[in-house]
Amino acid sequence: IGLLKKPWGQYLVMEEKFQTTYRLNKKEKEEAVDIILSTYPDAKAELDHSNPFELLIATILSAQCTDVRVNIITKDLFAKYKGPEDYLKVDVKEIEEDIRQCGLFRSKVKNIRESCQMIIDNFNGRVPETIEELMTLPGVGQKTANVVASNAFGIPAIAVDTHVFRVSNRIGLAYAKTVEDTEKQLE
């Protein structure tokens, strides 16, 4: 058993395997969020991008891949492919080779190309700006939609992955059994 000092002065007793969870009351949650926001005032996506389309592609590539690896891949990828049309002009094999290092490359290429076609056909060549519309694109789930919506369009959204889920529930910011419920509680 060990002690974990919470930033606002209290101690939390942690079991050896960190299975203990702590429920914060509303005031404690607000204090914790204030500390996080003051500590990380300029928090943003770690994926390199210069426009919403690049962020969408980078976020699709980030599944089961580190942001560092994605940023290495997208440096050349974004120089080669400027917009949705560019991904549709070349052979699938060429794009697969371009993103091979990020894993799951075949399904990612399929999703990217289908998303590009939908962006052209359904959204006048522009990345959709709502979470609901983003989630109609192949390979875009709640987390990806939230990342794009919040970072590209300034829409308040929290991207809850397994890490955010685990830590939020462990330190008491949420008390939920699913990623979806954790997201609702963090909003």
Residue ranges of each PLM-predicted region?
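Catalytic cores of DNA base-excision repair glycosylases
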Residues: E15-E187
